[in-house]
Each structure stands twice: as C-alpha cells, then as structure tokens.
C-alpha cells in the first residue's frame, strides 16, 4: 500500500509496481583527483497512472587537499524528479543539486566536515530554492 500526496495536495492510496535501476562509477585519475558519476531511473505504475523518476550527478574529490587526510569535494546533479507522468498537474521542473564540502581531519580518530548545499526547485517547484549549511563530525573507533 502506498500513501502519498500528489502535486495538487490530494491524498492517494493504492498498489504501485516499481522497477528501479541505478549505475555508479568512480575513477581515480591520480592520487589527488577522483571523479565519480551516478544515475538512477525508476518506473512507477499504479495501474492507472505511470511516472518515470530520474536522478543523476557528477562528483569531484581532491584527497589530501591542504593536509594528509583532508578531502575537498564538489557534487552537481539532479535530485530525484518525476518525468513523463500521466498524472495531470505534475510539476515538470528539474530540481538541481550543487554541493561543496571540506573534510578536515583533526586527528587519527576525529574529522569535521562543513559544507553547503544549494537545491534549485525542490519538489519540482519553480523559484523555491533552498540553501542548506551542514556540519558533520565523524568519530572513528
């Protein structure tokens, strides 16, 4: 059973058939440069309407940037979005994701990673951008 709201705010329930696929790759071009990419696709069918859901992205990582153990990273891509919907009123704007972060290795066991994420058109709504600040602390045991 699926419970969700459509673009018009109406609650929908019912069975859904989902076929999902994904691919990812990472290429270490040098000890200081890593490129990665991913893509996903899902076909959702509730036997009345059909939706295609896509996401994809590219990333660049610079290991040991500034100091051994640190990492500078950038990600650009599309948040999951509906395309090819047969449901009237479904938004068609693609929500893009831009991210930058810097992992600073404090010592062998603790790192702190500040970052910023900018998402354009979240929820596939035009002119509704979001900027998110992040701080992650990792403790390694």
PLM segments and residue spans:
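Residues that define the transmembrane beta-barrel architecture of outer-membrane proteins
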Residues: 17-21, 50-56, 94-98, 128-133
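C-terminal hydrophobic structural anchor segments
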Residues: 61-108
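Residue-level signature of outer-membrane beta-barrel architecture
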Residues: 27, 62-64, 104, 118, ...
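Surface-exposed extracellular loop regions of Gram-negative outer-membrane beta-barrel proteins
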Residues: 22-42, 112, 134-138
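Repeated loop/turn-to-beta-strand initiation elements of outer-membrane beta-barrel proteins
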Residues: 3, 32-37, 65-72, 106-114
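Outer-membrane beta-barrel "beta-signal"
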Residues: 60, 129-141
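Sequence/structural signature of outer-membrane beta-barrel proteins
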Residues: 3-11, 41-48, 79-86, 119-124
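Transmembrane beta-barrel strands of outer-membrane/channel proteins
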Residues: 37-41, 58, 74-78, 114-118
